[in-house]
């Protein structure tokens, strides 16, 4: 039997030297574009189902909206392809799908509000969907702007103290303003100007995450210093508790002066998780949990709004027509949805107050059922896991803590929201990331996404190859005549 013929040189060209060149690293940008197209398809079909159920007529305008949505995120995709080519290909499509589903649900609730107004001969309210679309466009501008301007995320560490100060000021401003310029539904969390309302706490949490990531890296020895051992765990020394006490006092101040339980809980929990990641000490978690319990007990004893929320959580049907109406309607809506849901546009989610903001999870559970709600939660889970995977893969400590802090912010916020609407924990007023109606939350989430993508790009990029010093050919090497040393005469 004859030996097999060697492969032709045309099929496998060999460069000089006989070694094949290394293939270029994969950026997965084409996969990202395909996933964006799939997300657009899901959003368009969802819009079709809502229109068919509510309006009983479907026009080609739905396809135009779908194409416009795809074009908007295609621009974001091009920015990622140009300025973060090695970033995780799942982060942007997941955010696009969540944002799109949120727009569909807000539009569905707008139609319900219009029907209710027409039935009662009230003025038709202006739709909130148009405003949310505008904020989505502004979010894309912020997202692309961060990708373009921030060439290296490690630059943020140089300005960490400035960013931390700005974050603290942003948290404090609503408490200092008169109620007419800052208060809504009892919470002073807004800055209201003519034609503009901003919730600075949404942006402050990102600035504070950057600050704490830098401090935990620079002062790591302070947080990991040898302390006391108890029950097999190492606890920090009393004099090293200053930083976490400062964070605790700031969060208590937010709770006291702004009546914002959600933001104070979110910031303290995120800092506590980052502290544990930086030190790997369970003692910090125990101390943080104790401080959290002390703060809640103090707030319950001192402030009526905390007592009301706690009593509503424990006994939602005791005052059904007043304080318990929100959570009761939320539970009824989730029960109505069952496993498969009533179908998009076929439920009655507008019965729940603040269905577009605090209770949009209830809308999902009612119309898409437990299966649909689980699918949405799975999207968030994948987003958080990919963010934590970025934290593990990135090479520098600041990037690790930054990515972990941003990822856990989304995870903790989602847990607090879902726990509130399902009566697992008291209601806090936080909104669902990327989905709930609101400009400040959406813009801040796209800024968070841009930072996470920049860290992911650095984590997945191939390590730079160090150039070797050129070696002169042997023919061009200089020749030196060495003379054998003469033997020294013995004395």
Place the predicted regions along the sequence by residue.
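Short, Lys/Arg-rich, polar N-terminal cytosolic tail immediately upstream
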Residues: 1-27
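Membrane-helix boundary/helix-loop-helix interface segments in multi-pass membrane proteins
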Residues: 17-69, 74-258, 418-432, 437, ...
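Hydrophobic alpha-helical transmembrane segments
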Residues: 67-72, 134-142, 366-385
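Transmembrane alpha-helix boundary/anchor motif
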Residues: 74-78, 211, 297, 301-305, ...
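Hydrophobic, glycine- and aromatic-enriched re-entrant/interface helices and adjoining loop segments
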Residues: 171, 181-197, 276, 284-376, ...
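Membrane-interface helix-loop-helix junctions at transmembrane boundaries of multi-pass membrane enzymes
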Residues: 226-240, 387-408
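Hydrophobic alpha-helical segments of polytopic membrane proteins
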Residues: 238-301, 313-315
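Loop-to-helix entry and N-terminal half of a specific, functionally important transmembrane alpha helix
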Residues: 391-429, 435
């Amino acid at each position: 039997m004859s030996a097999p013929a060697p492969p032709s040189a045309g099929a496998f060209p060999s460069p000089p030297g006989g070694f094949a060149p290394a293939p270029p690293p994969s950026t997965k940008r084409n996969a990202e574009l395909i996933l964006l197209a799939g997300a657009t398809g899901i959003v368009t079909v969802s819009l079709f189902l809502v229109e068919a159920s509510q309006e009983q007529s479907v026009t080609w305008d739905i396809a135009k909206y779908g194409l416009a949505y795809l074009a908007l995120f295609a621009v974001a995709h091009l920015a990622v392809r140009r300025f973060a080519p090695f970033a995780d290909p799942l982060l942007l499509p997941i955010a696009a799908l969540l944002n799109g589903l949120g727009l569909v649900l807000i539009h569905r609730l707008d139609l319900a509000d219009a029907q209710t107004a027409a039935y009662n001969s009230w003025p038709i309210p202006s739709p909130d969907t148009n405003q949310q679309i505008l904020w989505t466009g502004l979010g894309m501008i912020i997202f692309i702007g961060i990708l373009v301007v921030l060439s290296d995320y490690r630059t943020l560490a140089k300005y960490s103290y400035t960013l931390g100060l700005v974050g603290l000021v942003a948290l404090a401003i609503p408490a200092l303003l008169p109620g007419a310029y800052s208060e809504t539904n009892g919470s002073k969390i807004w800055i209201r100007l003519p034609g503009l309302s901003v919730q600075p706490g949404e942006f402050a949490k990102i600035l504070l995450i950057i600050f704490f990531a830098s401090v935990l890296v620079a002062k790591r020895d302070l947080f990991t210093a040898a302390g006391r051992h108890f029950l097999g765990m190492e606890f920090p020394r009393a004099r090293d508790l200053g930083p976490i006490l400062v964070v605790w006092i700031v969060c208590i101040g937010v709770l006291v002066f702004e009546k914002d339980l959600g933001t104070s809980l979110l910031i303290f929990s995120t800092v506590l998780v980052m502290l544990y990641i930086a030190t790997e000490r369970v003692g910090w978690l125990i101390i943080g949990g104790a401080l959290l319990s002390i703060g809640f007990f103090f707030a319950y004893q001192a402030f009526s709004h905390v007592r009301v929320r706690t009593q509503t959580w424990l006994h939602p049907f005791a005052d059904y027509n007043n304080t318990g109406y929100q959570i009761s309607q939320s539970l009824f809506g989730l029960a109505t949805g069952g496993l498969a849901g009533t179908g998009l546009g076929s439920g009655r989610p507008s019965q729940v107050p603040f269905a577009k903001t605090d209770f949009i999870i209830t809308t999902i559970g009612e119309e898409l059922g437990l299966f649909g709600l689980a699918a949405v939660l799975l999207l968030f889970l994948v987003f958080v896991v990919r963010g934590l995977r970025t934290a593990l893969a990135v090479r520098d400590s600041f990037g690790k803590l930054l990515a972990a802090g941003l990822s856990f912010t989304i995870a903790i916020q989602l847990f607090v929201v879902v726990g509130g609407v399902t009566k697992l924990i008291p209601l806090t007023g936080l909104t669902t990331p990327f989905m709930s109606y609101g400009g400040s939350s959406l813009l801040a989430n796209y800024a968070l996404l841009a930072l996470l993508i920049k860290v992911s790009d650095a984590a997945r990029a191939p390590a730079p190859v160090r150039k070797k010093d050129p070696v002169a050919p042997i023919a061009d090497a200089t020749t030196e005549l060495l003379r054998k040393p003469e033997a020294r005469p013995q004395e």
